[in-house]
A protein has these predicted regions:
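Active-site-adjacent alpha-helix of alpha/beta-hydrolase-fold enzymes
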Residues: 80-89
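Short beta-strand/loop motif that positions the catalytic acidic residue
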Residues: 59, 65-67, 71
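Active-site acidic short loop of glycosyltransferases
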Residues: 60-61, 88
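Hydrophobic "lid"/C-terminal helical patch
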Residues: 8, 44, 82, 109, ...
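Catalytic active-site module of serine/aspartate enzymes centered on a nucleophile-bearing elbow/loop
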Residues: 89-121
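Conserved alpha/beta-hydrolase "acid-adjacent" motif
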Residues: 72-78
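Conserved Class I S-adenosyl-L-methionine
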Residues: 37-38, 59, 98, 104
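Conserved alpha/beta-hydrolase catalytic His-Asp/Glu region
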Residues: 2-57
């Protein structure tokens, strides 16, 4: 198991979730460990050097902006900024969520999506 995998998993999930879900830990760790690390690091470099020059203000569709409360990769502040730029957007912060709250907090994420879709049909 690579140190990089362990670090990523600690950023993406709460300690409690990882303790209670060892199979998920092993599966995702295995996927990360099987990655070509040179390519993996090149992709991460894109995130670091990325210029925020998208035309988000041109988005006309109703948009759900969502992040986990404890996500250090897609922070609440980043999501608030995006929510302010996209005119028809709604911000949802998933309580206790980290980067992969779609897995760890699946019920909350799914409910937020369902509520957003139901409200905007």
């Amino acid at each position: 198991e690579l140190k990089l995998s362990r670090q990523a998993l600690k950023r993406w999930f709460s300690d409690k979730y990882l303790e209670n879900n060892p199979d998920t830990y092993k599966k995702i760790s295995s996927i990360l460990s099987a990655n070509n690390m040179a390519n993996f690091l090149r992709v991460y470099e894109l995130f670091v050097k990325h210029k925020n020059d998208e035309d988000f203000e041109k988005i006309q569709s109703k948009t759900l902006v969502m992040t986990g409360e404890h996500d250090i990769g897609s922070t609440i502040e980043m999501s608030q900024q995006l929510n302010n730029i996209i005119k028809n957007s709604e911000l949802k912060i998933i309580k206790d969520g980290k980067h992969l709250c779609g897995i760890e907090c699946a019920d909350d994420v799914n409910l937020a999506i369902k509520n957003f879709v139901d409200k905007n049909e």
